[in-house]
């Protein structure tokens, strides 16, 4: 790694860390680029050479969080996959809780898209067989919103439960177990 690469990495890390720190203190909408650059100790032009806006910084944060989160092995069980997702959220809860609890629209929309794409297909067939008269769009909405609410509850109040227990609660509510 060249010294320039290290400087770029160090600068991006400082901006990212400052942004996360601010997200833990206040909601996204009230954070200014000025606050980010002050806390990161970088210049405005430096910030804008890395990110066009705080929204694109948030987008990168979401992509970073979701990249490993939703990766899965070929023949993994639904329970094991969901346990992996909950474990990942717990491991990254410093980054996630502020976005989740602030009800940040962008973060929630991205999370919903990922859940619709990765989680819903794993439970769709069983739900459609069990509830053939319920529209697919409703079932998808039910699976996704219940996942987000279960995650929110667990991170706020249910920390005494292990990931696999929370997955059991979630699947029991979906009547998948």
Pin down the residues of each PLM region.
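Append "Primarily bacterial transcriptional regulators
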Residues: 15, 34-39, 47, 89
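Amphipathic alpha-helical linker/stalk segments
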Residues: 21-24, 31, 61-85, 96-97
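Short hydrophobic/aromatic patch on the recognition helix
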Residues: 41-50, 147
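Helical hydrophobic small-molecule/effector-binding pocket
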Residues: 77-123
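Amphipathic alpha-helical packing segments from all-alpha helical-bundle domains
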Residues: 105-149
């Amino acid at each position: 790694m060249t010294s320039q690469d290290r400087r770029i990495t160090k600068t991006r890390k400082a901006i990212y860390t400052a942004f996360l720190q601010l997200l833990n203190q206040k909601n996204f909408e009230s954070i200014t680029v000025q606050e980010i650059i002050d806390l990161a100790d970088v210049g405005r032009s430096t910030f804008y050479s890395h990110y066009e806006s705080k929204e694109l910084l948030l987008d990168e944060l979401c992509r970073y969080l979701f990249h490993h989160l939703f990766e899965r092995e070929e023949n993994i069980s639904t329970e094991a996959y969901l346990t992996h997702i909950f474990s990942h959220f717990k491991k990254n809860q410093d980054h996630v809780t502020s976005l989740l609890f602030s009800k940040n629209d962008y973060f929630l929309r991205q999370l919903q898209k990922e859940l619709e794409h990765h989680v819903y297909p794993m439970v769709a067939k069983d739900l459609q067989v069990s509830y053939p008269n319920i529209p697919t769009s409703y079932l998808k909405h039910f699976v996704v919103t219940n996942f987000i609410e279960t995650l929110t509850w667990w991170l706020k109040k249910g920390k005494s439960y292990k990931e696999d227990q929370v997955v059991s609660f979630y699947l029991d509510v979906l009547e998948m177990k």
